[in-house]
Amino acid sequence: MKARELQELRQGSSPQDLQEKVQDLKSELFNLRFQLATGQLENPMRIREVKKSIAQIKTILREKELRAFEQ
């Protein structure tokens, strides 16, 4: 995920939207792992990218939670 996309997620997305995005990425990760197990995966680096994106979005969610708690 590019820095610009992350910035847009930080500023313009609600926590519900971010949760939906995490769920979509988790289902994609499941499918990628299934393809890996069956030998059909074309781009193994995609697994790493998806895991990193999930972590980045979860970090944004946590930042929003802490910001809301402080106020």
UniProtKB/Swiss-Prot annotation:
Keywords: Ribonucleoprotein, Ribosomal protein. The keyword Ribonucleoprotein applies. GO terms for molecular function: structural constituent of ribosome. It comes from the Bacteria. It holds the Pfam family Ribosomal_L29. Gene3D superfamilies: 1.10.287.310. The keyword Nucleus does not apply. Residues 1-20 are annotated as: Disordered. Disulfide bonds: none annotated. SUPFAM superfamilies: Ribosomal protein L29 (L29p). One of its GO terms (biological process) is translation. GO terms for cellular component: cytosolic large ribosomal subunit. InterPro entries: Ribosomal_protein_uL29 (IPR050063), Ribosomal_uL29 (IPR001854), Ribosomal_uL29_CS (IPR018254), Ribosomal_uL29_sf (IPR036049). HAMAP family: Ribosomal_uL29 (MF_00374). Belongs to the universal ribosomal protein uL29 family. This is Large ribosomal subunit protein uL29. It comes from Clostridium kluyveri (strain ATCC 8527 / DSM 555 / NBRC 12016 / NCIMB 10680 / K1). The lineage of its organism: Bacteria, Bacillati, Bacillota, Clostridia, Eubacteriales.
